[in-house]
């Protein structure tokens, strides 16, 4: 199974009250990224350590209980791709 982890432990996250958007600052590159709710929560799961896609999805299903489970699973898949593309997340070896 592939496990994903954040590329840096020095990422700085900021969630704005009352909104569905958050930002993350990457001090390595100086880049700031805008995150949707699922991407932010995915990162929060990974702050504690690498996880498989299934582990991330289970965590999201607990976090977003009112949402359609199939939609949440698709949103997690999309969030992982966005985070990988942005350089914030990658696969890690066991």
What is the predicted role of each segment?
Residues 28-94:
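Long, charge-rich, low-complexity alpha-helical segments
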């Amino acid at each position: 199974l592939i496990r994903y982890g954040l590329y840096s432990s020095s990422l700085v996250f900021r969630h704005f009250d009352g909104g569905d958007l958050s930002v993350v600052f990457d001090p390595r590159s100086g880049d700031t990224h805008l995150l949707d709710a699922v991407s932010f929560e995915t990162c929060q799961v990974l702050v504690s350590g690498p996880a498989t896609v299934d582990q991330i999805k289970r965590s999201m299903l607990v976090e977003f209980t009112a949402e359609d489970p199939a939609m949440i699973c698709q949103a997690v898949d999309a969030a992982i791709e966005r985070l990988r593309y942005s350089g914030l997340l990658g696969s890690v070896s066991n």
